Each structure stands twice: as structure tokens, then as C-alpha cells.
Amino acid sequence: MRLSIALTGIVSIGLATTVLADYKAGLAAYQKGDFKTAVAQVRPSAEQGNPSSQFGMGLMYRNGQGVPLNYQEAFNWFRLSADQGNAAAQYNLGAMYNNGQGVPKNLAEAVKWYRKSAEQGNFRAQFNLGSMYQLGQGVPQDYKEAARLFRLAAEQKMSVALFAMGGLYFKGHGVPQDYNEAHKWYRQAA
């Protein structure tokens, strides 16, 4: 019995090492612009459930890199990765729902996935979710929540979020109107 458990553990470690090696080889090929090789290296580990590889497959299908452009296939790969907690995949699902790429446009789903990603610190998701609160798209308009989210993204030096914070202070939306504070945020964005 112990031998069986030990062998299972060794096989699992071996498979995990292979999956990681495939992912790293695929990532290196992707960074060199060799997308066909990237797909060939990443797909096996994606099919074995590696969330980073699943995200990579989604990215390549979304951009038509090494595979034909296919938003539905990109969505499917992003969903597999997002369900395992990958913040970048969650952000991409939010964007696909927000733009109606690969799925019907659904602002409530966009908000859901942006929020999951934003809670993990993804500044793009924080900004996009903040924009949805600012405009009242998929959520009730809430300038204070928009300011909170923009600030989180701005703290990560996202220039458009810095600019958005300037706009909120200039207009007094969700924060006290303060032209000096607006100027400070605008200068940081420049």
C-alpha cells in the first residue's frame, strides 16, 4: 500500500515537472514570437489543467497567434484558467463579456469577472470596474466606488487611472472637489 502511494506521488511529481517544463518552453517561444512552437508546447499542459497554460492558450486564440483567431475558443480557455483563480484570465473574461467577444455582451458577467480579478490586485480590472461604476454600466452609478478602484489602479502607476483620479477631483465626483489635488493627479499621469 505504501509503495503504491509513493509511486503515485512520484508519478504526480514527474507529471507536474513535465507540465512546468512545457509551460516554460512555450513561454520562451511566445516571448521570441515563435507562436506555433508556443502553441505546441503549451497546449499539452493546458489540456492537463495548468491554469497558466490555459491562460496562454486563451491569449493566443484571442490574438490569432500560432492559431486562427477564435474568440469562442479564447473564451473557453480563459474560463478554464479563471475558474482556477488566474487573475489575468478573470480580467480577460470580464473584457470579453464587456465587449461581446466570443460571448453575448453581458455587463453583469463583466462586472463579476472584473471584480474577481480586481480583488487579486489586477490594475486593469480595477480600472475597468471603476469605469463601470463611474458610468453606471452593469452596476448602479457610484462615484465613491469608482474613486476607490481608480485609486487602487493608480497606486500601481496606471497612467489612465491617475488621469481618471484627476478628473474625479476636478469634478468632485466621489471625492471632494479639489483643483490642487486634481492637478497633482494629472501631473502624475503625464
Where are these regions (language model features)?
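Bacterial N-terminal signal peptides that target proteins for export
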Residues: 1-7
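Cleavable N-terminal signal peptides
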Residues: 8-9, 19
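Sec/Tat signal peptide C-region and signal peptidase I cleavage site
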Residues: 15-21
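Short helix-capping/linker turns of helical repeat alpha-solenoids
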Residues: 17, 29, 33-34, 47-50, ...
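Hydrophobic face of amphipathic alpha-helices that form TPR/SEL1-like repeat modules
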Residues: 22-29, 41-45, 56-63, 92-99, ...
